[in-house]
């Protein structure tokens, strides 16, 4: 039995609140149960130096956790003087995931930075950030379209969403919260497009290795979860 009493293939309640920031071109507060992430998409009419004069744009991401997003206060990374390895890994993952569904030529020579700030953490912050980051990016492109800068459907080729799966007490389960994630035998993150394309899979065994059959079961759970997340994204931006 899962601590939350959810079925093995049941996600936490997921919601998207658009327009949460009056300053950002695109913004979204995404909630996966008790994991809450504020995603903002900011437009800059410039690109990294290595992309100048190419006619192509760029999408990047930054990720951070507020000091009291967790049970005990975390020290701000800025106060420590450097980003931790986990932070760098996650923000690179978010950026890669979003770029997988963006036509950089259609975007034009601008940069969009998607900032993902974890307000409250209860497992799955990176998957929530990717899923909510897509909504914030969509809203930024919609802002640009209203100013005749781009066509959203030309730039954004597909949806992107992410979900965690794991083996908890011997059973494959979908969308782990912290109580499950902290003791799971296997923990995996799946990033997929709306059309079912795989962008990234991260899978780790904690203790004993897992089998191909167990991985296939996790993949099946993930596909079902991604389908539901994409449906929720579609409703959020309609």
Swiss-Prot record:
Q: Which GO terms describe its molecular function?
A: 3'-5'-RNA exonuclease activity; tRNA binding; tRNA nucleotidyltransferase activity
Q: Which reaction does it catalyse?
A: tRNA(n+1) + phosphate = tRNA(n) + a ribonucleoside 5'-diphosphate
Question: Could you tell me the EC number(s) of this protein?
Answer: 2.7.7.56
| InterPro entries (alphabetical) | ExoRNase_PH_dom1 (IPR001247), ExoRNase_PH_dom2 (IPR015847), ExoRNase_PH_dom2_sf (IPR036345), PNPase/RNase_PH_dom_sf (IPR027408), Ribosomal_Su5_D2-typ_SF (IPR020568), RNase_PH (IPR050080), RNase_PH_bac-type (IPR002381), RNase_PH_CS (IPR018336)
Record organism: Brucella anthropi (strain ATCC 49188 / DSM 6882 / CCUG 24695 / JCM 21032 / LMG 3331 / NBRC 15819 / NCTC 12168 / Alc 37)
Family note: Belongs to the RNase PH family.
Under the subunit heading, UniProt states: Homohexameric ring arranged as a trimer of dimers.
Signal peptide annotation: none
Which biological process annotations from GO are given for this protein? rRNA catabolic process; rRNA processing; tRNA processing
Q: Which domain of life is it from?
A: Bacteria
| Keywords carried by this UniProt record | Nucleotidyltransferase, RNA-binding, rRNA processing, Transferase, tRNA processing, tRNA-binding
Q: Which CDD domains match?
A: RNase_PH_bact
Q: What does this protein do?
A: Phosphorolytic 3'-5' exoribonuclease that plays an important role in tRNA 3'-end maturation. Removes nucleotide residues following the 3'-CCA terminus of tRNAs; can also add nucleotides to the ends of RNA molecules by using nucleoside diphosphates as substrates, but this may not be physiologically important. Probably plays a role in initiation of 16S rRNA degradation (leading to ribosome degradation) during starvation.
Protein residues bound to phosphate:
86, 124-126
Protein's UniProt keywords contain Mitochondrion: no
HAMAP family with a match to the protein in the record: RNase_PH
Identify the PANTHER family for this entry.
Answer: EXOSOME COMPLEX COMPONENT, EXOSOME COMPLEX COMPONENT RRP41
Q: What is this protein called?
A: Ribonuclease PH
